Regions:
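Ferredoxin-reductase
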Residues: 2-92
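Low-complexity, rRNA-contacting terminal tracts
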Residues: 95
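A short, basic/flexible loop-to-alpha-helix module at the beginning of a structural domain
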Residues: 98-100
Length: 100
């Protein structure tokens, strides 16, 4: 697990078609990046009475001057993270890992 995790909040979700969404999340103070750079989005997942952390890599679709971070998420059938990301609603919290 990354030591450089930051909680972010889902601002907006756009469903483009079944299995494809874009999400916009809060941009951490001072966060800089290059367009197309990969980061990891993670969730605390409840399973079998325990909470486990899982994350996957995603490419930033926003530009550095945007006040938010945007990602396109393709849902992987039976995946651990992408179906949960696609199901999130505005206001939900998730983790951003930036030390890739």
């Amino acid at each position: 697990m990354s030591d450089n995790r930051t909680k972010v909040r889902l601002l907006q979700k756009q469903v483009w078609r079944k299995g494809l969404v874009s999400i916009r999340v809060t941009k951490p103070e001072g966060f800089t990046f290059t367009p197309g750079q990969f980061v990891r989005l993670g969730l605390d997942i409840e399973a079998n009475g325990k909470t486990e952390y899982a994350a996957r890599g995603y490419s930033l679709a926003s530009v550095p001057s945007d006040p938010f971070l945007e990602f396109f998420i393709v849902e992987v059938p039976n995946g651990l993270v992408s179906p949960r990301l696609c199901a999130l609603e505005a206001g939900s919290e998730l983790w951003l890992e930036t030390d890739l």
